[in-house]
Amino acid sequence: MYLVDTNVWLELLLEQERAMEVQQFLQSAETIQLSMTEFALYSIGLITTRLGKEEIFETFISDILEDSAVKRICLTSFDLKRMLTVRKKFHLDFDDAYQYVAAKRDNLILALRYSVWVVE
């Protein structure tokens, strides 16, 4: 099972350079195997609306949250505190540490923009 990072979704939604690779990855996995964090969802909302692409975010909500089996993950307060420790230990920025802790907690493979990361 995969935790799909914000940048992977954005690559496809904003039709960036590697959008076809992302599309192939998403099509190769059943939606029941895919997860995303609340943080990723809100980040996608922030970015798309700042770019004036609200319709892309609205379609994303319909496709990913309402019409598919993609699981949405939210960290607890304990997880958030753990995230701060992980961030310092591995010198990660906030969003990467958030994704790392979510993947570790739920035993997911973290699908990043240009690689797949097995969190142990």
Language-model segments: residues:
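Short, well-structured N-terminal submotif of metal-dependent ribonuclease cores
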Residues: M1-M36, R50-S62
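Histidine- and aromatic-rich ligand-binding microenvironments
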Residues: D5, S35-T37, L92-D93, Y114-S115
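A generic structural signal for short hydrophobic patches within well-formed alpha-helices
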Residues: W9-L10, L41, W117-V118
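Phosphate- and divalent-cation-binding pockets in alpha/beta enzyme and binding domains
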Residues: E21, S43-I44, R82, V119-E120
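Structured helix-beta-strand junction loops
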Residues: S28-I32, D67, D106
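Short, conserved active-site loops that position catalytic residues or coordinate cofactors/metal ions
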Residues: T37-S43
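Active-site-proximal, substrate-binding regions of enzyme catalytic domains
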Residues: S43-I73, F78-L80
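Active-site neighborhoods of divalent-metal-dependent phosphate/nucleic-acid chemistry enzymes
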Residues: V70-R113
